[in-house]
Every structure is written in structure tokens, then in C-alpha cells.
Amino acid sequence: SSLLNILIQIAIGLLKAIKMKVIISMSGVSHRFTIAGYNVPKYLIDVDGKKVIEHIVDLYPVDSDFVFIINDDCAKNPHIPAYLESLNIDKLTLCSVPVHKKGPVFSISEFEHHIEDDEQVVINYCDFSMDWDYYDFEEFVNTTDCDGCVVCYTGFHPHMLGGDNYAFCKTDDDNKILEIKEKEPFTNNKMLEFASTGTYYFKKGSYVKKYFKELIEKDINVNNEYYVSLVHNLLIEDGLTNLVYEVPHMLQWGTPLDLDMYNQWSDYYRKVIEGQKEIVLPNCVTALPMAGMGSRFSEVGYLLPKPCIQVNGHYMMDRALHCLPKTDKVILGALLKHKDLLPLRDYGEVVWIDEVLQGQACTTEKIV
């Protein structure tokens, strides 16, 4: 048993010495971004001080074997290939394909001669980033010896509030993928499903060649585009093992709305971390009406009045006041029956309301 473990570790070490082929497909025309006013390809848009492609490259070791696939229009612009070749990576094969709308599987199939049959291949889309540990992922696929793997996330992410859908995985209890749908969740609550980040792993380059060709020949598409996610269904049909590798956070920039939502959240958290510049409004009063019952919160088990519910270690009312400009005086309007529950001794002037009124406007009228 101990000898077997040693041999397994040696095998993993040898596999680590062989770098995965990382193919980044970015040959699309970014039509929605063009309509939204962007004048560069999606992968060259600035996000948090770096271009999208830089975020993607940073997901992998600098000595990875990269293949970038762009379209001919971008390739004809001398600044774009020059920029891509200047990135901090050791090995890059830059390819271009005529402009088309057939999806990433078609683009990658055009350059299968760059893929060795026995090498591991990761295919990465060009419009996101994520919180992950590449070396943990590498160890996961090598230890499990899976034939395919989809990097996924679950739970709340801001872009999940929008109407756009991505690829979703149906799994068993061991996170073995049973089926993948593109642009469509399996249930009415997509936040509980495994959603693909846009990173797809294949144990062998021969799988990429065989199943990408099969997907196109069988014309398995969504809106006339051939997606990498759907290739995994073909592997599954042939009895090959495909697993989910879960990451805690994913940053989606696939559409202008996704990017706008991300930037809003990013700006907010940056201000929280760095501290907002204090705004002072002289000759003004801040009125905080909080004399409601908070019935929706109590119905789901909250015992304290809503203003005192903790949000990231602070009272909800503190969070609200922190977002507001500093004024000469703060007046709180609170419900009298909550007097013993609300720690308002240090909050300046408090007006206690005898009964629940018809909304915040009525409460404000009482306290100012």
C-alpha cells in the first residue's frame, strides 16, 4: 500500500513536469460589446486595471504551453498580435481564423494540428476570471484520472441575477457529470446548480480531435454555435468519466451587462477596502425611519428588529448611516415596542413611535 502511494506520487510528479496545453479561444466578434460602444475586442477590455486576457493568463503558470486563437480582422491589426506576444508567458502559439459565427469548437478544430494526441488540454474562454489554485486543479485531474473536467461554481454571483444563462452541469453525489446544457439551467433555481466558468479539461488531445469533429458532424449546436461544454456530453455517451472541479468564486464578463454589474460591485468593495472620502453636508439633517415591524425577517426566524440585524459584523442601521453624507444631526424614528431591543443610546436623537405607520414617509413626517 505504501509502495503504491509512492508510485502514485511519482507519477503525479512526472505529469506535473509535462505542461498542459492551454488553448484560449477568442475569435468571436464581440457583437454585443460593439453595440454597447466598446471599440476593442472583448479580451482587450480593461477590468480592474488589467486587460481581460491578462486576467486569464494569470490563471496559469507562465511556463504553460499557450495557444491563442484570434480572428483574421484582429490579426491584421499589428498592435493586437504584438500586444499578445508581449504578455508574460514563456511559450505562445498565436493562430488566426477567418471571422465566423460558428463558436469556439469550430475555431479550435481548425488548429488541431497544434495538439498532440497524448497531451492534456485545457480550453479557456476569453471573458472571465475566477478564484482558483491551478496546481490544486492539476492535482485533482491527475489524481482522479478523469477523462474530462468542467471547472464550475455555484451559489450567489451577481451576474446570476441577470437574464443570460451559461452552461450548467447535472451531477451525481460524487460530482460526476451526467449531462451538460448550454444556455439553459436544469431547474428553476440556477444558483443551486453547477455553472461552468468557461474552463474545460480533456485528458488527451485525441479526445479534443475526435469529439470536436463529432460535435460538428452531428450538428450539435445552440443558436448555430458549437460550444465546448456540449462536447463533454459526447464523452459521457461513450462511458468516459467527466467530473466537476468546483471553485468558490467566478468573475463573469461575458456580456456588457455582466461587465457593468461586476464593475459596480468591484467599485463598491474597493471603496469599502480603501475607505470612502467623507462627504459633509452642512445645515442638513439625516432622518432614518426604522419604525416598521420587519415582519418578513421575523417570519423566517430573525429575533431582533431589522435595524439591529448584523451585516458583516455591524448593525444594519450602521451600514445605512455609513453610506450617507455626514450632516449636522441624525434623527432616528424607531418603534416604541422595540425600545428595549434597540441599542440606541449612542445614536443621538431618537423619536419613539407608538404604532406602526403607513410607510417610511409617514414616519419621517413624525420625526422631523
Question: What residue ranges belong to the model's regions?
Answer:
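Conserved N-terminal catalytic core of the sugar/cofactor nucleotidyltransferase
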Residues: 7-10, 15-24, 32-39, 45-46, ...
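A structural signal for short hydrophobic beta-strand segments in well-ordered beta-sheet cores
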Residues: 44, 169-171, 244, 308
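Short acidic donor-binding/metal-coordinating loop in glycosyltransferase active sites
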Residues: 126-128
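Alpha-helical elements of Rossmann-like donor-binding domains used by nucleotide-donor carbohydrate transfer enzymes
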Residues: 109-110, 136, 230-231, 261, ...
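Conserved alpha/beta core of the MobA/IspD/sugar-nucleotide pyrophosphorylase nucleotidyltransferase superfamily
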Residues: 22, 193-286
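Conserved core of the sugar-phosphate nucleotidyltransferase
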Residues: 130-219, 340-342
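Serine residues within intrinsically disordered or low-complexity segments
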Residues: 1-2
